[in-house]
């Protein structure tokens, strides 16, 4: 972990696990903003469901972006609701959230180049709809204006349609690995999480 540019424990890799949970992720959004304020960084980050989206904004260095999605965009017609369900078949508008708003020409774009340039390893958990097993995407699975890895991580059954990506179909990562601490330990043999 880096705090104000200095490694707190020499030669020790650190990780950040950000769970999902819908609107309760507004809390983790505030924590991630505080990490940005204090210049706290991690070697490895993994997010699940809404936590994967929060982690992406954190790695992009976009303080306040996550909060806008929980407060400002929440009442927009394409975001979520019964009308959205009747119009699109989905309660949560993943395409609206992670394309219309998030793309480079959207109302609240994510700084994709900053994610790529961030030295932290980043994984996002999704659930393979055929096997029920977790799948771990990386930032290499994302491209500018193609955030299907995040959408797959957030595709809560019944509330959203599954996401087709890389010749597979995926649901929310919380179904298969809701708090991926063991993945973090196994991935980098981390000591501090």
Give a label for each model feature.
Residues 1-48, 56-192:
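Patatin-like phospholipase
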